[in-house]
Amino acid sequence: MHSRQQTIFALSSGRPPAALAIVRVSGPEAAIVLERIAGRLPPPRQAMRALLHDASAQPIDDAIVLWFPAPRSATGEDVAEFHIHGGRAVLSAVIAAIGTNENLRAAEPGEFTRRAFENGKLDLTEAEGLDDLIHADTERQRRQALRQLQGLLGDRARDWRGEIIAASALVEAAIDFADEGDVPDELIAPAKAKIEILLDEIEDVLAQEGRSEKLRDGLVVAITGPPNVGKSTLMNQLARREVAIVSPHAGTTRDIIEVHLDLDGYPVTVIDTAGIREAIDPVEQEGVRRARSRAAEADLRLWLVDAQAAGDGEDALRAWMAQGQNGFWVVRNKVDVAGEPTGELSATGWPCFSISAANGRGVAELIAALGKFAAAHLGGESALITRARHRDLLRQTADALGRAIDLPEQVELIAEELRIAAHRLGQLLGRVDVEDILDVIFREFCVGK
């Protein structure tokens, strides 16, 4: 592992070519590097125009440079930034000039953010929010990530931890009295009252049913059904481009095709699967096996049938339902040819839609319904928990608080449960016992962040 005392540098903006590029340097040598390349240091936190030079005094670029002395910087260390023209040659020359300085090395993925975390500029939940913000594809993902970055969960966790410590102080005082054979109720009762309020608040957060976690990853919708009913044509309609091969021959789709949709800010991944039938071809058999597996994991399955022969898919649909599969919508396709659909599939009780994937009839209504489904199953504006790590630690915190409440007057055991609860919230914030997960979390970041 690299030393945190080393100075690091990296491109912190998009890849060239671009109008501008930002190269960031962080660490004890940042001022030396900036002065060598720009000629002098600008006033702290003020932009300065400078002609950059390499080690042989050859000019590189007319740029803007900034200087952020520690601790008032993004990482908490000395930080220099070079705002340069975003051509490949310019960037390469600036990176080369920086790299010729001693005690410098290229930054690892997420290393700037990790240094900010280690220097107390943000807690672990806020760092995770920053990672989510970088990877947000939709507006609602962006909003949720920004709330996390701004400390929505971290602030609540710090408040809870402070209340637990206050309750612990009362219990510890009661322990002192217990040594004398008397446990005063006026100490234990208010402590347990605090704990009960905290437990109710945490249980309310845990009751959010993982919707915010789901918003990070998005819903998965599988298009399933018998072969040659128009699944690939529907996939192309949803994607508004040709992503799947359309053929009159059954069994054309043999692998799984994915399309990512943004439905009113909600992320939805639609997968087109091989037609469900008893296949003879080994390749098609494997496609059917994969289709069944992925569809079983999906949040919603669109069972597509030919409106001219809707009953042909009924037995297969009921077979899936008998296996405990849920979340089905029946979609009757080819109504442009068949007219009003026939069959008894609506008797299954699942929502039914009539469309023509060929000319787009009814597809807008299907997409609108998918958007409503996503809104009903993904997080709201007040959601706090966005990762399984958050949920696990809050559940452990709540369990410890619950045990503390259930203990009668065993003050030493109550104190221990409160210590466990405070420790779990410390882990949530990244302040205790998290070294083993830091590498995993910050490795998800891009280089330069």
From Swiss-Prot:
Q: Which residues make up the binding site for GTP? A: 228-233, 247-253, 272-275
Outline the extent of the TrmE-type G domain: 218-375
Q: Which Cys pairs are S-S linked? A: none
Record-listed (6S)-5-formyl-5,6,7,8-tetrahydrofolate binding positions: 24, 81, 121, 449
Please state the Enzyme Commission number of this protein. Answer: 3.6.-.-
| KW Metal-binding (keyword) present | yes
State how the cofactor is bound: Binds 1 potassium ion per subunit.
The GO biological-process annotations, alphabetized, read as: tRNA methylation; tRNA wobble uridine modification
| Cellular compartment(s) | Cytoplasm
Gene Ontology molecular function, alphabetical: GTP binding; GTPase activity; metal ion binding
Which keywords annotate this record? Cytoplasm, GTP-binding, Hydrolase, Magnesium, Metal-binding, Nucleotide-binding, Potassium, tRNA processing
Please give the cofactor(s) recorded in the UniProt entry for this protein.
K(+)
Q: What class of enzyme is it?
A: hydrolase
Q: Name one GO cellular component term.
A: cytoplasm
Respond yes or no to whether keyword Metal-binding is given for this record: yes
Q: Where does Mg(2+) bind?
A: 232, 253
Q: What Pfam families does the record tag this protein with?
A: MMR_HSR1, MnmE_helical, TrmE_N
Q: What is its main location?
A: cytoplasm
* Record note on quaternary structure: Homodimer. Heterotetramer of two MnmE and two MnmG subunits.
Q: Hey, which family's this protein in? A: Belongs to the TRAFAC class TrmE-Era-EngA-EngB-Septin-like GTPase superfamily. TrmE GTPase family.
Function, as annotated: Exhibits a very high intrinsic GTPase hydrolysis rate. Involved in the addition of a carboxymethylaminomethyl (cmnm) group at the wobble position (U34) of certain tRNAs, forming tRNA-cmnm(5)s(2)U34.
Q: What is this protein called?
A: tRNA modification GTPase MnmE
